[in-house]
From Swiss-Prot:
EC number: 4.2.1.96
Keyword Lyase: yes
Alphabetical list of CDD domains matching this protein: PCD_DCoH_subfamily_a (cd00913)
GO MF entries: 4-alpha-hydroxytetrahydrobiopterin dehydratase activity
UniProt entry tagged with the keyword Nucleotide-binding: no
Domain of life: Bacteria
Protein name: Putative pterin-4-alpha-carbinolamine dehydratase
Keyword set, alphabetical order: Lyase
Alphabetical list of HAMAP family matching this protein: Pterin_4_alpha
GO biological process, one term: tetrahydrobiopterin biosynthetic process
Catalytic activity: (4aS,6R)-4a-hydroxy-L-erythro-5,6,7,8-tetrahydrobiopterin = (6R)-L-erythro-6,7-dihydrobiopterin + H2O
Coiled coil (residue ranges): none
Amino acid sequence: MTQLENKHCVPCEGTAAPMASEELQRQLSSLPEWTLVDDSGTSKLVRVFTFKDFQSALDFTNRVGQLAEAEGHHPALLTEWGKVTVSWWTHAIGGIHLNDVIMATKTEKLV
């Protein structure tokens, strides 16, 4: 992992710009399991985590929720039998901010 796992999210005003493409690609090199997805013009970091059963997926979902509350930055979570889809983006700017990369990095540590 990178040093990002030791950083914390900072409040992001709606005036902040989404992360530049070159910087985002550089950051994603340390997150090979994450995919950059364009959802109706909004860039998101997305990863599907797989588990042996629903309870394991639910436990992971709760750990991500606790992390999100602690950092004040919240993902979209889809919990299904044996898998959880985590999507990070910054609603206020309609794209990806350094906070999202920090949170994706921290999410990796929860598995």
